[in-house]
Amino acid sequence: MHIQVINFGINVSHEDFVVGATELAPNFASIPGLISKHWLGDEENKVYGGVYVWESKEHCEAYKAGEIFSMVMSSENHVSPTSKDFGVLEAPTKITT
């Protein structure tokens, strides 16, 4: 398992972001190796993003080489996007999941 966290500011309203995200969500549902994506939003500070749970680091790397990731990172509505990957500590995670 592998975790990716993407954060960015937005230059649209919260409501417009939610509408756009809801329209885009089906595109993420079919990405190979993506177990889940949790959409994040901090309306007060206009910071949004997602926590992606991948089957493997290789699946995450394949996503980062693809069109959807490129779109997320270069969208005119996203301000200063960042992406950070994390390995999962399996032993303690098994206890808490």
Locations of regions flagged by a protein language model:
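Short S/T/G/P-rich N-terminal loop/turn motif that feeds into the first structured element of a domain
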Residues: 1-48, 57-65, 77-97
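Short, polar loop motifs at secondary-structure junctions
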Residues: 68
